[in-house]
Swiss-Prot record:
Gene this chain is encoded by: truA
Keyword tags: Isomerase, tRNA processing
Catalysed transformations (reactions): uridine(38/39/40) in tRNA = pseudouridine(38/39/40) in tRNA
The protein, known as: tRNA pseudouridine synthase A
Disulfide bonds: none
Domain of life: Bacteria
A molecular-function term among this protein's GO annotations: tRNA pseudouridine(38-40) synthase activity
Positions contributing to substrate binding: 111
Stated role: Formation of pseudouridine at positions 38, 39 and 40 in the anticodon stem and loop of transfer RNAs.
Organism: Xanthomonas oryzae pv. oryzae (strain KACC10331 / KXO85)
CDD domains tied to this protein: PseudoU_synth_EcTruA (cd02570)
Length: 257
């Protein structure tokens, strides 16, 4: 039987989502598979909606797995969470259709990046916030970001290690706002390139400080040259909010579009 899980994790202590082999360092995937396999009393493999890098967090990562073990969804949720490290928790578990796929059934994916914007570095929440001491104009960042909307070639914002076959993505929404001392960037797209959100944020920061004009982002997008864009923002400020699926899959409301 196929199940879908919603998984929350603090990525600070992991080398990313993906299991990278025996000597690849701790991963969220390896921890989750070990816990599920213990509950199932048999090997379990999971497929996720979107892989995250080292230090990046997950608010509602969605995975699917198959198992012949007879367990109620609540049993999977509680039993698996009890076997996971404190930095990972299963938020929900539901039966899924046999043809549901955590990655390929997703219609969109959402990320949030949070920057503490003040002169003094953070003592609290430093694992879940990035820090920028220079004053940022969040309104200018928001205006500049709107140039990225729609289906475009995002070569200027992909990492050199990106293995995607092409750089075209459909960026459906991007919003920048200030909430007290925090500047927050929320992004939604059909899919993302490696480091795409962090590279966008790194470039928007240069607009926010006034080092670059608002129309610079549009120029970067058109130029498709990663070497002239801003630096990659640090990983700790980034959270994978989660994917969105059509209602036909009958998943919880937070991941249904």
């Amino acid at each position: 039987m196929r199940y879908a899980l919603g998984v929350e994790y603090d990525g600070s202590e992991f080398q990313g989502w993906q299991q990278l082999g025996e000597h690849g360092g701790p991963s969220v995937q390896a921890s989750l598979q070990a816990a599920l396999s213990s509950v199932a009393d048999a090997p379990v493999q999971v497929v996720c909606a979107g892989r995250t890098d080292a230090g990046v967090h997950g608010e509602c990562q969605v995975v699917h797995f198959d198992s012949d073990a007879h367990r109620e969804p609540r049993g999977w949720m509680l039993g698996t969470t009890a076997r996971l490290p404190p930095s990972i928790a299963v938020r929900w578990c539901v039966p899924a259709a046999a043809d549901f796929h955590a990655r390929f059934s997703a219609r969109a994916r959402r990320y949030r990046y949070r920057l503490l914007n003040r002169q003094i570095r953070p003592a609290l929440y430093r694992q879940t916030l990035s820090w920028e001491r220079r004053p940022l104009d969040a309104d200018a960042m928001h205006v500049a970001a709107q140039a990225l909307l729609g289906e475009n070639d995002f070569s200027a914002f992909r990492s050199v290690q990106c293995q995607a076959l092409h750089a075209r993505r459909n960026l459906q929404a991007i919003h920048v706002q200030r909430i007290g001392e925090v500047v927050e960037v929320q992004v939604q797209a059909n899919a993302f390139l490696h480091h795409m959100v962090r590279n966008i944020v790194g470039s928007l920061i240069l607009v926010g400080t006034g080092e670059q004009p608002a129309d610079w982002i549009a120029t970067l997008l058109a130029g498709r040259d990663r070497t002239v864009a801003g630096p990659t923002a640090p990983p700790q400020g980034l959270v994978f909010i989660g994917p969105l699926y059509p209602a036909e899959w009958h998943l919880p409301a937070e991941v249904t579009q």
